[in-house]
């Protein structure tokens, strides 16, 4: 069995990462950095690995897309978080993928129900860059007036964000990661292409 390292100071590092994630989720579009790890569990980047170490546990099934799924990641995730790994995206609380995500995989993610909207999945999407893409205007909770971002996104994700095909409060929350940095776009955020 080959394992990757986790946080050096598990409690303090997880608390720090949680506070940074809370900032990102409560202030959509704000980029935060997670510096607790020296490296991610390849092919996962530092931010994705940190999010999983901070949020995943035995009650949160994790789905890893094929490009990001390997034995070392699986063993490390099971050992450090005890999170169950699932083979289908619709079973996941946390879905982890990269820009190769298909519309079918995205549409399979749980969006919750009217009775249990919190059952909607969180999609952790590794992107090439958090800048240099189409300019997006974010409005809504946690944003004073508007916030502009330009991450490089696959078309299916852009469509999901701008169309929001599910009535609120249903939907998915999105965390975009690149290296040790991330930004979040919760389902409460309204997104427009500029």
UniProtKB/Swiss-Prot annotation:
Q: What class of enzyme is it?
A: transferase
Domain of life here? Bacteria
Biological process (GO), any one: organic phosphonate transport
Task: State the InterPro entries in the record.
Answer: PhnH-like_sp, Phosphonate_metab_PhnH
GO cellular component assignments? alpha-D-ribose 1-methylphosphonate 5-triphosphate synthase complex; carbon phosphorus lyase complex
Q: Is Cytoplasm a UniProt keyword of this protein?
A: no
**A Pfam family that the UniProt record links to this protein:** PhnH
Protein keywords:
Transferase
Q: Known catalysed reaction(s)?
A: methylphosphonate + ATP = alpha-D-ribose 1-methylphosphonate 5-triphosphate + adenine
Q: What family is it from? A: Belongs to the PhnH family.
Q: How does it assemble?
A: Homodimer. Forms a complex with PhnG, PhnI, PhnJ and PhnK with the suggested composition PhnG(4)H(2)I(2)J(2)K.
The record makes one more remark, namely: The sequence shown is that of strains K12 and B.
Can you say what this protein is called? Alpha-D-ribose 1-methylphosphonate 5-triphosphate synthase subunit PhnH
């Amino acid at each position: 069995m080959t394992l990757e390292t986790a946080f050096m100071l598990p409690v303090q590092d997880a608390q720090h990462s949680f506070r940074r994630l809370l900032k990102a989720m409560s202030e959509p579009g704000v980029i935060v950095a997670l510096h607790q790890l020296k490296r991610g569990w390849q092919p996962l980047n530092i931010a994705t690995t940190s999010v999983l170490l901070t949020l995943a546990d035995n009650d949160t099934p994790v789905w890893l897309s094929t490009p990001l799924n390997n034995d070392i990641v699986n063993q490390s995730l099971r050992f450090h978080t005890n999170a169950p790994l699932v083979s289908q995206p619709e079973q996941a609380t946390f879905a982890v993928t990269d820009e190769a995500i298909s519309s079918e995989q995205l549409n399979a993610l749980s969006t919750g129900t009217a009775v249990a909207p919190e059952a909607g999945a969180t999609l952790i999407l590794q992107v090439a860059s958090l800048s240099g893409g189409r300019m997006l205007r974010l409005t809504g909770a946690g944003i004073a007036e508007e916030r502009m971002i330009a991450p490089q996104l696959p078309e299916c994700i852009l469509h999901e964000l701008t169309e929001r095909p599910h009535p609120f409060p249903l939907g998915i929350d999105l965390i975009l990661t690149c290296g040790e940095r991330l930004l979040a776009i919760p389902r409460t955020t309204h997104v427009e292409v500029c």
